[in-house]
Curated annotation (Swiss-Prot):
GO terms for cellular component: plasma membrane-derived thylakoid photosystem II. May be involved in photosynthetic membrane biogenesis. Keywords: Coiled coil. InterPro entries: Thf1. Disulfide bonds: none annotated. Residues 211-221 have a biased composition (Basic and acidic residues). The gene is thf1. This is Protein Thf1. Residues 211-239 are annotated as: Disordered. Belongs to the THF1 family. The lineage of its organism: Bacteria, Bacillati, Cyanobacteriota, Cyanophyceae, Synechococcales. Residues 183-221 form a coiled coil. The keyword Nucleotide-binding does not apply.
Length: 239
């Protein structure tokens, strides 16, 4: 039996895979996500599925959307996955495939599938995955909740205009069929949205600081490029 890896080992693996410094605004985000994912994946009842993959990709991409330099976003994601013994390319492919499945065909049929209605048409083996979730023990996580809601929203957007109604119907019709607390799912979705809002505010502050620094640098460069004014030699006539 393999020993459960420790949080310190997971952190060490991450920083070994990505030794570069992470921008201060995002370092806490990455570390908190790493801890959350570690605790989820070492749970003995954790099951990897496309909904978890979609949740992880959605969470990460949403929180790290404005990270600079942009080319480092994927490098950090890859290091995060590898530290958790997950394959980043598989995660992204599973997430894309799930979004494509939910976006194809009749929206109401896809919605019926998520609601586990007996007459719902199965696509991509999703019915078996969802039915597996109904059989406890099944590790619940915020990442899984975000994945389920993201898949649901693909079809629900065309049926229900208001976000509040979409969330309410998701809790009533999808989560209620699963052995998860609807209240906990609701709070986790609220936490996710508030985290996105905080990151947007933080980005706005950082962007303003960058603009201010750039303006100050431009003023200095302009001042340095001005020709020196000669006042002449006061000891000479006409000076």
């Amino acid at each position: 039996m393999n020993p459960v890896r420790t949080l310190s080992a997971t952190k060490a693996a991450f920083f070994s895979a990505y030794p570069r410094p992470i921008n201060a605004v995002y370092r806490r985000v990455v570390e908190e996500l790493l801890v959350e994912l570690h605790l989820t994946t070492v749970n003995s009842t954790f099951v990897y599925d496309p909904f978890f993959a979609l949740g992880l990709v959605t969470l990460y991409d949403g929180l790290m959307e404005a990270y600079h330099p942009p080319e480092q976003r994927e490098a950090i994601f890859n290091a995060l996955c590898k530290a958790l013994h997950l394959k980043p390319e598989v995660l992204r492919k599973n997430a894309r495939d799930l979004l494509e499945l939910m976006g194809s065909g009749d929206p109401r049929q896809r919605l019926d599938l998520l609601c586990l209605k007996p007459e719902a048409e199965d696509v991509g083996g999703l019915k078996a995955i969802l039915e597996r979730m109904t059989q406890p023990p099944y590790a619940y996580s915020r990442v899984l909740a975000v994945g389920l809601y993201t898949a649901y929203e693909v079809v629900a957007k065309s049926l229900y205009e208001e976000p509040e109604e979409r969330t309410r119907r998701f809790l009533e019709n999808v989560v209620s069929k699963l052995p998860f607390s609807t209240e906990r799912v609701r709070k986790d979705l609220e936490l996710y949205r508030s985290s996105l809002d905080r990151m947007k505010q933080a980005r706005a502050v950082v962007e303003e600081m960058v603009k201010a620094a750039r303006r100050q640098q431009e003023r200095r460069q302009s001042a340095a490029s001005l020709p020196e004014t000669s006042l002449g030699d006061p000891s000479k006539p006409g000076s």
